[in-house]
Every structure is written in C-alpha cells, then in structure tokens.
Amino acid sequence: MAKNKSQYDSTLNLPKTLFEMRAGLPKKEPVMLKDWDDNDLYNQLMKHNEGKPQFILHDGPPYANGNIHMGTALNKIIKDIIIRDKNMEGFQAPYVPGFDTHGLPIELKALSSVGDKKKDISKLELRQICEKFATEHIDIMSDQFKRLGVIGDFEHPYLTLKPEFEARQIEIFGEMAKKGYIYKGLKPVYWCPDCRTALAEAEIEYGEDDCDSIFVRFHVSQDPNGVLAKHGIPMDKTYFVIWTTTTWTLPANEAICLNGQFEYSFVKIGDEFHIMATELVKSVMDACHIENYEIVGEPVPGTEFELMRYNHVYLPKEGWVILGDHVTLESGSGCVHTAGGHGVDDFNVCQKYPQVPITVPVDDGGYLTELAGKYAGQRVWAANKTILADLTESGAVMGQVHIKHQYPHCWRCHHPIIFRATEQWFCSIAKFREDVYKAIDTVTWMPDWGHDRMKGMVRDRNDWCISRQRTWGVPIPAFYCKKCGTYHITDATIKAVSDLFRKEGSDAWYKYEAEQIIPAGEVCEKCGASEWTKDTDIMDVWFDSGSTHAAVLEERPELRFPADMDMEGGDQFRGWFQSSLLTSVASKGCAPYKSVLCHGWVVDEQCKQMHKSAGNGVEPSEIIKDYGADIIRLWVASSDYTVDVRAGKNIFKQLSEAYRKIRNTARFILGNLDGFDPNTDCVADDQLQEIDRWALAALDDLMVNTSAGYAVYDFNKVYHAVYNFCVVAMSNFYLDVTKDRLYCTNGAGRKAAQTTMYKILVALDKIIAPILCFTSQEIWDFMPKTEGMNKYVVFEEMPKAGQYAADEAFKAKWAQLIAVRDEVKKVLEQARAEKVIGASLEAAVTLYCNDAVYDLLNSIPMDELADLMIVSQVELVKGEGGAASAVEGLGVAAAHATGEKCERCWKYSSSIGSHAAHPTLCARCASVVEA
C-alpha cells in the first residue's frame, strides 16, 4: 500500500525493519567474515555436527602461484555450497583446503626473482626461495577464498610441500615400485625445450601452429630381397617418398615404415621411380603439383620391401625399411619417416627391429647436436627452415604445402614442445590398466559421460612419465650404484627416505650425500658394490597431487578414505582425477573416491575463452567490490555448471536484480514481523485462512524441489525454484493479497498471516543459506527467534518437505482460484484503460458462474475473496454474463465500486461514516481504531 498522509497513518501496521533494502554487501560481508573468524565458525560447526554421519568432499589442490580467477571462484563456491548443505542435511562435512606447491611455474618465478644470480645459487637455496613464494601465495589465495564465503580449515590446510605429505608420497612411490609399476627407461616423451624438462600428457595443451608439410625422397641403396630387379626397376634411380610436418626430425631418421597390409606402386616421373602406397599416388602427385607421371607394373605388397636399405637425405648413413601397423592411408604417402628418438609410434616400431638405432640429435634446450651434422647448434624451429631450403636445393623435396594444424604446447610456458627420447622414470599403466577399468566402474560420475571419458583416457594413454629435470619438487627416491650404474630401490631405502623427509622435509635430499641417507648394509643387486649416488630428478607434480588420497585422507583424523566426492573442472580428467585414480589403484587396488563431479570452464558473455590480452575477463575482486561475494555465489548457483559458464558485467548486473527480488521478499516479511514473537504469537493451523495454507503448501513444494536439487548438486534447480517462489508465489500473489490483513487489522487474521510468513521465512532462509551465505545470515540476525534456534543459520537443519504438504484436491482448487484471479486482473486492466477505475480497490467485480465455479468461489468468505482479487467488492451470480474468460463457466464484469473510499484502508464501502467519531472510515477500520 502506498504511503497516504492521513491522521490514521499511525494506526496502520506498516512494515518496519532495519533490514535494509540496499544490500551493501561489499561493506557488510567483511564484518560478517570477522565475526565468523572471531567465533571460530568452522570448528564450532564441526563440533556442532560431531557424531553425525560423515560426508567427505576432498579438495583438489589449486596451484599456489597467483590470485584466484573466476574459474577458481566457480570451483570453490560449488564446493562450499555442497559443504554447507551437507552440514545442514544431517552430516558432519569437514572441508580441508589444499594447495599444490611444487613445480615449474614457482621455480621459474623464483629464478626470475634472483636475476643474474640464478647461476650462482645452490639447489637448496633455490628451493628455499620457491617455498617462500608458495607460502606467500597460499596466504593470499586463502584470504581470497574466505572472502568468497568459503568455510573450511584454512588454519590447517594440506600442503604438498609439508614434510608429512612428502613422506607419505615417497611411501606411495615405494608401494608402486615394489609391485613393479615403476621403472626407468629410454622412451620418447613430451619435452619442453624452454622449460628443459619432460612433461606428462596432463601438462600438454593444443594450439594452432603454422608448418611446412613436405614430401621428401630417400634413395634406395640396397635391395636384399631383389624386389626391384623382380619388377624391372633400376635401383640407382629409385626412391621411397615420405611425408612429414617436422622437418627438424629428419637428422634423426633411421627407418622408413610401410604397412605390410597395403599395396605399393612404382611411380615413374621422368626416368626416376618413386615408391608410395597405391591408394595415395594421386593425392601425392596433386600435392606435389606433378601432372606427368606413370604407374609402372603391378602393385607390390608392403611386406616385400622389408629390410631394404636407403641413403639418408644428407647424412652419411643408411636407413632400414621396416613394417608397422600404425601406418595409415589417411594422409601422406604410406611411407612413414621414422625417427625413434622423436615419436612414440616410431620408437615402438623400432623396438621390433634391433638393427635400427634410436638417435636423438637434440639437446635439452631444443638445439641440434653434432649428430645432426652441419645443422648442429641450430634450434629445431630455425632448423626447419634451413633443412628445408637445403633439401629443396638438392632435389630431395618433391613438394611442400604450408598448413595450419593443432600442435602440442607446454601448458606452463605455452611454447611448442617436441617429442624426445630420454632416460626417464615411468609408471607402467599397462600392468594395472584392467584394475583401473574396474575401479572406474565403481565410481558415480556426474555428469555420467565422465565414466566413458575417463575409461577412454586410461585406455588410450601411454605409460606415465613421472620424472622431471627440475629442482622444486619431491625427489625421485632412487640411488645408483657408483660401480655399475644400476638403480636401487628397496623397502629399506624407501623407509629411510620417508623417515628423513617426515623429520626434515625433502630439502634433506639436497643436504646429505647418498651414503648419509641410504641404510647401512644396502648392496647393489647386480654387482654387490655399496657406494652410491642419488637420483637428480624430481617427481611430476601430478604425482604430488595424486598422492593426496594417502597423504591427506588417510592422515587427517577428521577425514577418511575413500572420499565421498572429488569435484573439479573437466580438465582434471587428464589431471588430478586421473593421477589420483592411478596411484590409488596401483597402491590400494581401488578408486580414491566414491563419486566425481565435474564442472565446465568460465567463458565470457559471447562464450569465448577469457584472456587478459583480449580484455574480456572479469575478476572476482571486481565483482566483489561492485556487488559483493553473494552475487558471485548466486551466479554459480544460477548456472548449469556442468557445461561452460558465461560470466560478464551484464550477467552480474542481471543477477543483482534477481538477488534484489529475493532480498526484498525477505525484507517485506521481516517488516511485517515487527513486534511478532514466535514464542507466543504463532496461531494454530486451524486458525489459518485457506490462502495461508496455500502459501505453506507452496513452501512445501519449494522444499521438495530444492531438496531434490541439492541432492544431485543441481543448484540451478534450487535457484530457479527459490526465485520463482519469491517472485511468483510470494511477491506477485500471497504477499500482495495479505497486505490489507497485515496493515489494517490487529486480530487473528493478521496473526495468521504473520505466523505463515514467519514459517515461510525461516524455511526460505535455511534453503538459501548454502548459496547466499552472507545474506541468509543477515536475514537470520534480524529474524525473531524461538527457543533453541542457533546463532548461525548454517548450524540449523535444512527444512524437511511434508510438514505443510497439501492434498491434490486442495492444490487443484487453488490452481483454479488463481486462474480466476488472473481472469479478473485482465478485466480490471481493461476497465483501467477505459478510465472506469484507477487502482484495483476502486473496482467492484461481478463473477458470473456455472454451478461448479460458483461452488468453488462461494467456499471462500466474500471478504477473503475480495482480498484475493484486491478489489473492494465481489458479487457471485449464477448464470452467464460479463466478459468470457479462459476459465470454463466463468464470466467477469467490472464496475466502479459503490460507496465511498475509506481514508485508512482505501477500500470502498457503504459503511463509511457509520461511526460518528470517524466519519471517513469504514466500519471495520473504525472498530480497529477504537479497539
């Protein structure tokens, strides 16, 4: 009701509350955070829920090297909503945040910080700088997470650099080594020349690069099987044609691989013959822009060419022709340039031919060595151009095409990587792959496509390269015999290293000599010697984070193994989800989690990836400054986070409007609960009006929907249910209809409405508490309390559906009453347009009804029916009349109400002036004022 200057204003029960319309969250939230810290909210919550069933959400550790971004905020808020909800659903749900603290980015930052001195500092000094950098960022990120409203044990997070963590990680390594899953060997691995270290598959990202696709011919030098002579082909004029996009690998060429299942043809160009797959002749000739050629003789099976020899294109050596199933007809020539030192398929096929050497003419920094001949000293990317130019000049290049293709890059420095065969430590996935498949089947994957995605990744992956040639990390706990070089790992050495790390941390590896660490009495299994050196590599950081199931879940008393849930972004299928799964299955034989929940990426409003250079990013700090953290939390809840989530200033502006409607619903109720004491003023259910019971039934439906949403972590469903309840059921209907009862009366009707609103607000506030953690607490602080209610809303139990449920007949009745109301509103709008009425209280409505509609409407007292329509007078007439409506058997007519307008309630009534002392009031208002 609008404010009306009148002598009777003071007699109205207008809403009154200190709960502000403007949220002011950026200022209020820090005050609440201080209160939560001062009162140790998290630990008090854990104590409050002690003895209840546990729900363990295991935190995947973010990397401790920078400020949080919107993706991090999305991740942490989803987790916090789950944690808060579970603690309100009858569980004790602890949250131990973690941080991934080792690895290359921090090491590079540390090296950058010392400038020119980096060549002079020791490994131990570098590690100390790295630890300081990581620790500082842990504090920064923890504060930023807490600013988002995330509750957890931030005073005691788990850190992968802690001695007890490193010790347990060494034990996991030892358990896997004991089972034969860890080995050292020469294999091609992803190698970053800029970071000078091996990389795992999880550390690779793909980006578009330009390159030259070239066809190169190699001259046949030996034909031990007499294939050429058999077909009348002169060997001195015959070539194998290969295709490659990595020109720099040609110095490493030791073989050409054909497929024994394919047929090959001799293609005559001029007086020279070129061998290529029969099915690819035309595509090769087209690519090389060769029009005049001739296929000579019949096709020859690929098997006949095995073990022929050819001359290298520029080096003084011969290569071998070999066979491999990996050769396809999808592109190229059917003759594959094979450099076992620079490709997995190449390496594997070369292992079948002992006579084919593995050559690696590239050093750690990506520079060609003396094995590359005249190109030694050139970086591989530059060598692409010079080698191509020289081979073109010599006539070895038959054709070239400049192409764009997806090429692997290092996810740390974002530069292109290479394949390079080096001695590395590996985890042999093949030895326990079937066990991993079985473990995957025991996990609940959300969304369910996660099951097939993980299984496919495990099926397709190679052995896991777990060693890195860097300093900042957990050392590989291996010793080497000084005499014969054999590596040495035993139960005793693992225990010695683990005990040392638990006592002094992994820095101890760099403080002591091998003889000071390895237990006395250890001898080399191969030669019996007992003098040792230490391994110089560190473990892949994915082995660090992949060990959390042991180092955290099994070690922290408030946690347990396995976790009920791991929840991270989709990129973690190749990262933490997978590394945890592999180490857990390898060491324990089971998955480390019962369920996995996956979220998408955060993109801009046009669904494009956010980049600083593009200027399309938004930072959590900016949104918090403008709107408050609760708006970010509402953004998370309003999104379908199982796919990519859009974020932008326009989106947050729209969400702030949605938030305002939820907030104002609570504010209206709080205003009308002024002076209401739920301990003494609540009325019994039989004193409620039907519309009150309808409102509580709508609340019960809300409980059903939000409970279902929370149960499957569908917060989007929770948000929409809450928003629709506040806007449609409450603001647009119930709260509007009850205004007259609330403002203008003091009796049982008002108490019934207040009782209803109180029950609604208590339940609604609990429902929104996991999402709007700050606003819900603010509402809770202003809410009148009954005995036994907690100081903090998160300590309360989530309301259970069923206590206000209505039967289907009641719901159907009120659905029809609301439909009638909607039809009345249409007619009132028309009357307003025709200037018959202004406000709806100026109207008198006549409802023409058939028997069924008449009985429906007549079951409601006429004054309540008028309030339902927000008009002054309602008349029911059996029969036809008025404007036809969408409700069968109903006609509606509107006229100006009879009588005069009451100065206090603004309704029109013929009873105005019936009380001499109050000539401008209706009889009802006069009696209220006189009471």
Regions found by a protein language model. Give the residues of each.
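Cys/His-coordinated zinc-binding microdomains
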Residues: 196, 469, 485, 528-529, ...
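Secondary-structure capping and boundary motifs in well-ordered enzyme cores
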Residues: 49, 53-60, 70-74, 78, ...
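Residues immediately within or flanking Cys/His clusters that coordinate Zn2+
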Residues: 189, 407, 478, 521, ...
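Short cysteine-rich clusters marking metal-coordination/redox-active sites
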Residues: 192, 410, 481, 524-527, ...
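Residue patterns forming the tRNA-binding/recognition surfaces of aminoacyl-tRNA synthetases
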Residues: 2-25, 31, 35-39, 111-251, ...
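Acidic, turn-prone loop/beta-hairpin segments
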Residues: 100, 189, 193, 199-207, ...
